[in-house]
Amino acid sequence: METFEERYALMHAAVQKHMPGADMALIDRAVEYADVKHQRQKRKDGSPYIIHPLAVAEIVAELGLDMDSILGALLHDCI
């Protein structure tokens, strides 16, 4: 089962690769907020739900989309 730390590292690397100079402090704030909002949620396989938004943000970064899109990916299930 994938951990938060593993998925965060993959997302972080994708952002740095495709968006050098990105405001990682802003991304980290969004990750922290999403993590709090999904704190008690688990996926069907038992992994923490936060893995999903991190994976979506990684895909968005790899597609070369902008910062707002990455933040939206991280926060898309927080409402």
Predicted segments — roles?
Residues 1-79:
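Active-site helical microenvironments for divalent-metal-assisted chemistry
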